[in-house]
């Protein structure tokens, strides 16, 4: 089952940038929308970097924007996303949400379709904990009215979903990560407005509690965990502009730390941790209508950033996960909002490249 949610056409930023190396085929409605918004051909021409150190892998079974991922027992689980766009007579864009839930085996590069999400969602949070996958929040229908607070658990042994205690308040496009036995949730959007609220779910007590708020209000952020710290990277400001803000929450100290700014401002990015470093991948900037392939590595010990090899195909809104020292990216949009892709890439990070 798939569900459509709608947003005002003014909310959408379309991107046509870079080299005409890869042109994705648009449906008629996508082509017309781009022409209406000022792009002469309406075609998506993503930024491509053939010299990139990233490798092209087996494509997704479907084109998908804004999925999310988590790694469990050496396999990657992909949840939700956006599938398609159409324009209705009232001038609004209807975006089809996905209930797809898929397991990917990096060794064989095969996808296995699992029991669908309890409902079609996009911009969810996904984490793994003690042999289960947890999916939280997200958008279901209209962005400014239907942000979710539901909390679901997936059991791989039974291929079944169960309901968990919902978040105190709804949010989507948030930062989520496991620190010990607690799921920390920070940033994100509620009814299209970025929030700074931070909460934690304690798996031992089965209760939610409030933590100190994040210093900044951001959504569409990247998230990774190293030790006792949750890192929240980049994202979009209340003006929907990409930011270079980086902050971390220290669970043992119960306080936030402001970190050195990222080299490249970006929102709609992915992030992972490998060998104690935090790596931000891709994203975009609505302010200057760009999608970036930048891959930015942060060393928590030296508090320094450096750039790694950029994505082969720049994108934002992709699912990002790590298995061992390899980063995987799935889908996303090489041109903002209306060009889902099935592209999959990997980068092997050796000793902090």
PLM-predicted stretches and their roles:
Residues 4-8, 18-353:
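Kelch-like beta-propeller repeat domains
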